[in-house]
Amino acid sequence: QSLELMRMEKNRGVQVTAETAPHYFTLTEDAAAGYDTNAKMNPPLRSEADRAAVLQALVDGTIDAIATDHAPHSCLEKECEFELAANGIIGLESALPLGLTLVADDLLSPGRLVELMTANPARILGIPGGSLQPGAVADITIIRPDQSFTFSEADICSKSRNTPFLGFQMPGRAVLTMVGGEIRFEKGLRSRHHSLSTDLSRHIPGWIFPTSLPVTLHTEQAGIAVPAAQLA
């Protein structure tokens, strides 16, 4: 009902925005059937019909942004009775890979995912970022959409481990993030803190999407570079 109301108001020209988080387009209430506290969140997970409605809203533009809803908790807050456990899960490390599952399943285009996770959030909040135009802040994430992996604790940078996605097969991942033109995160690549002017084609197989910055990547290889806003 909330999505239908949002869709109706947008069709009327009302300036409203909506966001969702990856767990709402990936999981259903069945994930909490065994009282797994890592599946306890607020709002709670709903039915398969609700999940399908969220997916449709992502596809048709009713939902403007995908946010992580990152909510780290200690073991003490989660390893207890379901009723007493804290709400929320971590989402920084799993948000992009889960978004890439929608691309792999042909539900979203790479460009639409970029809008949902970078350009739209920056535009809605009125903050710099979400753009690869000349003069924009050099915040970039390099993505390998072909680098599938099984999500494990080794992929988590947060101190907290409260995620329901351990063991999930992911179709792709972020392999490098630049902030202000400096490398701040890399997965199996070079050492940190190289400048943006470095010719990355010698180090990173991939292509850049979209491109305007002085970064050279081979377009015939598999990879995407997108603004880093909301992908960290």
Model-derived regions, located:
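Histidine/acidic residue-rich metal-binding segments in metalloenzymes
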Residues: 1-66
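Short, electropositive alpha-helical surface patch
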Residues: 3-18, 73-90, 122-127, 202-218
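Short acidic, glycine/serine/threonine-rich loops at helix termini
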Residues: 5-9, 27-32, 76-80, 153-155, ...
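His/Asp/Glu-enriched, well-ordered alpha-helical/loop segment
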Residues: 38, 59, 64-66, 71-147
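A short acidic, glycine-rich active-site loop
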Residues: 39-49, 86-90, 163-170
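C-terminal cap of metal-dependent C-N hydrolases
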Residues: 81-84, 137-207
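Cysteine/selenocysteine-centered motifs that mediate thiol-based redox chemistry or coordinate metal-sulfur cofactors
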Residues: 213-232
